[in-house]
Regions:
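PRPP-associated nucleotide enzymes
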Residues: 1-183
Length: 183
């Protein structure tokens, strides 16, 4: 992992969503979320580390009382392909019991990670589970769940920026980019 490799990744990518489109989509998503859960005093859980940027952009637009925490479940480990093994680094707190829980994540690829989160949270006694993702990847196979709120559908390519990384790089970009050949 080095600066040259990071620049190589960026050079072999293309912008698919602009920073302005990201901002507008997040504002619209916040309104939709508020319409559904503003009276529920939801527990909002951010999935680290990918959802950090998305969460930071979304939370200021949620203009209702909520409680916030984070969880960390990973499958990727700085690669561009998800692994079969999921690793809980920070599990949900007991505060999910008898709560409406909204989970924020950067992207829903195959849906396996979000399904595992949903199953764990519901088993812990949440009354309702909702998910919001910045992106959902369009893929051929069926998914165990779809997000309740989604900013963008993206093609079945490796995407990064706005919290999503490419080989550990570029979570900090304000745009969403897709790798091209040669990355």
């Amino acid at each position: 992992m080095n600066r040259e490799e990071a620049l190589h990744v960026l050079e072999h990518s293309e912008e698919i969503v602009s920073a302005q489109e990201v901002s507008a989509s997040i504002e619209a998503m916040a309104k939709a979320i508020g319409a559904q859960v503003s009276e529920d005093f939801p527990l909002v859980l951010s999935v680290m580390g990918g959802a950090a940027v998305f969460t930071g952009m979304l939370l200021p637009h949620l203009d209702f009382p909520l409680e916030f925490d984070y969880i960390h479940l990973t499958r990727y480990r700085n690669t561009t392909k998800g692994g079969d093994k999921m690793e809980w680094r920070v599990a949900p707190a007991e505060a999910v019991k008898d709560r409406v829980v909204l989970v924020l994540d950067d992207i829903l690829d195959e849906g396996e990670t979000m399904a595992a989160i949903r199953d764990r949270i519901m088993a812990m006694g949440a009354t309702k589970f909702l998910s919001a993702v910045l992106c959902e990847k369009t893929i051929e196979k069926s998914k165990p769940l779809r997000p309740d709120f989604c900013g963008f559908e993206v093609p079945d390519r490796y995407v990064f920026g706005c919290g999503m990384d490419a080989k550990g790089y570029w979570r900090n970009l304000p745009t969403i980019r897709a790798l091209t050949d040669g990355a």
